[in-house]
Amino acid sequence: MANLGCVEINPWNSKVSQLDFPDYGIIDLDPPEGMDFKNVIRIAKEFKSVLNDAKIPGYCKTSGSRGLHIYIPMGANYTYEEVRNFIKLLCHFVGERLPKIATMERRIKNRKGKIYLDYLQNRRGHTVASVYSVRPIRGAQVSTPLHWHELEEEILQSDFTIKNISERIESEGDLFTAILGKGVNMEVVLKSLLKISCSTCD
């Protein structure tokens, strides 16, 4: 693998045994180059607020590059299209709350320097860097699971590298084990999101 330059690990969202039914949905917070990481954290915290209100479990990790990834367990109960539409809805919620720094515009030139809320990674065959994957960038940064409270601290992508990730896992454990759990009941959480939307309109 080293000879081929295979540094990153980019798995599918589904297992071989259930290829059409993802184990989790991913919200990819993709900032433009030069964007203050504090803005990425602000958006992640807004997602956490929405998830908490709707009682949706969510797990955050660094991308290992510039952004953050938020994973939601789906339990291989829904198709890629259903999961993608669900994640798209969550992105709409947050995009409407933070329109000055967040966008769902696909074309980079039309994003106007905003952070892209990417739900399209939830398509069959699309991938993001795996949890604990090393990224092929200066410093050998690692895509690392976070406690949500760590977003309150002055964290940087460069805090998590190939040199210290083993020590972190020993001290914190594997924070991403739960993403392979039974998953959300989409019908129930959609009703919760509808209530949140209605209360906001009031």
Regions found by a protein language model. Give the residues of each.
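C-terminal accessory nucleic-acid interaction domains of nucleic acid-metabolism proteins
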Residues: 4-25, 31-35, 46, 81-202
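Short, contiguous, pocket-lining structural segments
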Residues: 39, 62-64, 82
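Short amphipathic alpha-helix segments
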Residues: 39-51
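Active-site palm subdomain of RNA-directed nucleic acid polymerases
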Residues: 48-62
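Short beta-strand
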Residues: 58-64, 105-109
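Short, conserved phosphate-binding/catalytic loop or strand-edge motifs used
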Residues: 63-72
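Catalytic palm subdomain of template-directed nucleic-acid polymerases
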Residues: 71-83
